[in-house]
A protein has these predicted regions:
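Acidic/hydrophobic-patterned starts of short beta strands in beta-sheet-rich repeat architectures
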Residues: 280-293, 332-346, 392-406
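Repeated scaffold domains used in trafficking and secretory/extracellular systems
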Residues: 273-276, 321-329, 380-388
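Structural preference for beta-rich elements and adjacent junctions enriched in aromatics
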Residues: 21-261
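Terminal domain-start segments
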Residues: 244-319, 425-439
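Acidic, small-residue rich beta-repeat scaffolds with periodic aromatic anchors
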Residues: 22-29, 244-267, 348-439
Length: 439
């Protein structure tokens, strides 16, 4: 009987002990701030030989940069690993377009026709200049995989603004899909191609469609918020550095070296550093280069004569003093045609004096045309005196004036190649101004 009582007590004791169930872990959610910014020093390519056509052999020599950080959705539920969803991107740029290759691993590429929503990729872009100033607003290009899943072509659509300036081609393969995209700079604002940058971000939106309660999983190449991608700050976007200015000039030097007969006549043999200005001479979408060194002027650009890079060189008859010249691009007479002004010092051949001389050129009808030259001032090399002239250019005439403070004791200055130069007004001439023909 005693044993029975003890057994009953033990049974009651055991029934009163409760074991706590293990706490269910909350799935980790995607966080845009976990993603690093991916920058590129993109290679330059020839637009005439590069197209968004689905032929990815163009990208064979260029590295893809991978990204797989979850921006939205839950790990282990909406995203199970890189094979479920991960991405990679590469960038090239040409004179008129920028190119993106986007490669996505996705174990289920879906269309909204099947059930809920299509898989999509968004490419967000904003150009900026060399000082980091925006050259246009933020634009998003939506690439819808749905039509491609259903047997058609990928749909490329700007999320705002005009629907032009972008081309996309994609194909679905084993374990994912590939997309080639080309975007014209003029679809984004002013071109940054010479020495600026393209800010970019790739956002990949994924739906597996195996659960009605699933959330969208999204990954990105920058810390972008999938719920409000337009809120991305420019400094948080990836930066593609562009430098067509240097690429153009190096190409010109390389070609000139191969074709120049005399080594000392090559552009690369210039004794003085090349001064290079970026400007618009030919009125084409891509800016041009104006370069000067010693006595040689070079004008280069795409669309100057044909669609390829072309350049034109011209040598002055007189040598400079060795001091750096100044390049100005201006419309001197208001006719809306840009002139090129080269200003430099030249030594007088008859007296120990130095003249500051300007040369005017215009590029027109696929040729560089010399317009005129004139002396701005003449200085005694010992600093004892100076004479100055000023010039005002209008559509009707050129007005030349003598600075009243000019030294009266100085003699004239003879320069090489001065036969077609405006005659300098001397204090001894007795004239204070002259009216000359217009340029």
């Amino acid at each position: 009987m005693r044993g029975l009582v003890c057994a009953i007590c033990l049974s009651l004791l055991c029934s009163s002990v409760a074991f706590a169930a293990p706490k269910k872990e909350t799935p980790k959610k995607g966080n845009p701030n976990d993603q690093a910014v991916l920058d590129f020093d993109a290679p330059f390519v020839d637009d005439s030989n590069t197209k968004a056509d689905g032929d990815i052999t163009d990208w064979g020599n260029y590295k893809l940069t991978e990204f797989s950080t979850l921006m939205s959705g839950e790990y282990d539920y909406d995203w199970t690993g890189p094979k479920d969803l991960s991405g990679a991107v590469s960038v090239m740029y040409g004179a008129e377009k920028i190119y993106f290759y986007i490669k996505v691993k996705d174990n289920a590429v879906v269309s909204k026709k099947k059930r809920w929503k299509s898989d999509k990729v968004e490419l967000w872009l904003m150009p900026e200049d060399e000082n980091g100033k925006a050259l246009g607003g933020l634009r998003g290009l939506q690439l819808d995989l749905g039509p491609m899943v259903d047997g058609g072509a990928i749909s490329a659509k700007w999320l705002s603004g005009k629907q032009s300036g972008a081309t996309a081609v994609g194909f679905i393969g084993d374990g994912g899909y590939d997309i080639e995209v080309s975007v014209n700079y003029d679809a984004l604002g002013k071109t940054p191609v010479m020495n600026g940058a393209m800010r970019y971000c790739v956002l990949v939106r994924d739906w597996d469609q195996d659960d009605a309660n699933e959330d969208e999983a999204a990954i990105g190449s920058c810390p972008i918020n999938p719920k409000n991608p337009k809120s991305i700050k420019r400094e948080k976007m990836g930066k593609v550095s562009l430098n067509l200015k240097d690429a153009m000039w190096q190409y010109i030097l390389d070609v000139d070296k191969r074709h120049s007969l005399a080594p000392d006549k090559r552009l690369s043999a210039a004794k003085e550093p090349w001064q290079i200005e970026v400007t618009d001479i030919g009125g084409t979408p891509t800016p041009d280069l104006v370069a000067f060194s010693g006595d040689t002027l070079v004008i280069a650009g795409y669309g100057l004569g044909n669609d390829q890079l072309a350049w034109f060189s011209l040598s002055l008859e007189s040598p400079g003093s060795g001091a750096p010249a100044k390049i100005d691009i201006l419309d001197i007479n208001g006719d809306k045609k840009p002139e090129i002004r080269i200003t430099r010092d030249e030594h007088c051949t008859n007296n120990p004096m130095t003249a500051n001389r300007s040369y005017l050129f215009r590029f027109e009808n696929n040729a560089t045309h010399y317009l005129a030259s004139y002396i701005n001032e003449i200085r005694m090399d010992n600093g004892d005196g100076v004479m100055k002239n000023t010039y005002t250019f209008t559509k009707q005439a050129t007005i030349q004036k003598l600075d009243p403070k000019s030294s009266k004791e100085m003699g004239g200055c003879q320069l090489n190649g001065s036969s077609d130069m405006f005659e300098f007004l001397m204090p001894s001439d007795g004239e204070k101004s002259r009216t000359l023909p217009h340029i």
